[in-house]
Amino acid sequence: MAYKHLLAAFDVGGSKTDSVLFNERGEILARVKGEGGNPLERGIDNAAAHYAAILNKLFLEGTGDETAPIDVLYGAVAAKEYFGSGLEDRLSVLLPRVRRLRIEGDGCALISGMLGHRDGACMICGTGSSVYIRQGDDYCHIGGWGHLIDTCGSGYMLGRLAIRAACRAYDGRGEQTVLCDLLEKQCGEPIWEHFIELYRGERPYIATFAHTVFEARAMGDPVATAIFDEGARDLAEIAHAAARRLGKPFDLVLNGGIFTAFPEYARAVGALCPPRINIVYSDVPPIYGGAVEAMYEIGQICEGDFRATFLEGLG
C-alpha cells in the first residue's frame, strides 16, 4: 500500500449526497453520489440506512474489499444538530469497518473548505439556507429552520415564489411575468397543470425551478427581479444577526449550489452584509471541506498539494 491512511467524507444536503474515499495525499480512490437525505424529512433511521448504503458502496469501490478498515469518516449532514449523537450511534453499528467517525452540521465543512479548521462562519444557499458559526468546538446556526418554517432566499424558496408568481398571473391576481414561459419550458406544460408532479417531487423538485428567477431577471422581468431582491435581503438579514451575535469582525464563507450556479446572487447578498464581515466567496465544493475535516482527525493540515490533487481528482 502506497499510503498510510484511508479516509472518507460525505456531504448531505436537501437534493443530493456526495461521498469520497481518499488518502492522505489527496488522491481520490472512489466517489459515489446519491439523492439527498435530510434526516428531518427522511427520519433518522431511514437517513442513516441511506448514508450507509452509499458509503458501503463507496468503500467497496475504493478498496475492492468488504472489510478493509477506514481510518476516518467525516460527515457533513444538514439538520444533524437536531438529533444529537443519533446519527453517529446508528452509523457506528451500520459501518463497523470505520475506526473513527465524526458527524457535524453541513456548515462546518463549508467553513473548513476555505478557512481550514478554525473559527469562522458560512452561509449556505442551496436547496435550503442557513448561517453556521463555529467558535472553537462549539457551533450554532441562524436561520435554516426548514422549508416548513423558514428557509429564506434558498433554492426551494426561489422556486416556490416563481411558481406562486406564475399561478397568480394565471389567476389574474398578479402581474404578468415571463416566469410562466420559463417554468412551462422546464416541465413541458403550464405550471398550474403540473401540480401532481410538484407535490410528488416536494422540496427538491421545487428547488429545481429556482434558475427561472435568474433567467427572467436577466431578461428584465420585474417580478423575477423582486423575488431575487427579496431573497438577497432575507439572506443578508441572517448575516446581520450573526454580526450582532458575534460582536466582532469575522469571515463569512458563501457556498452552496445556488451561490455556485448564480454568483450574481452571492455578490448581491455580500453587498448587503455589514462591513465588519469579511465575505469569502467559496471556490471549492462542500465535499472538499469534509476532506479537510477528515484530515484534521489524523492531525494533518491540508496544504496546497493536497488541495490541488483532491480537486483535480473530483474533475
Task: Tell where the protein language model's regions lie, with residue ranges.
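ATP-binding/phosphotransfer module of carbohydrate and carboxylate kinases, centering on a glycine-rich
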Residues: M1-G64, A68-I70, L91-V93, M114-A121, ...
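Phosphate-binding/catalytic loop of phosphoryl-transfer enzymes
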Residues: K80-T177, L311-G315
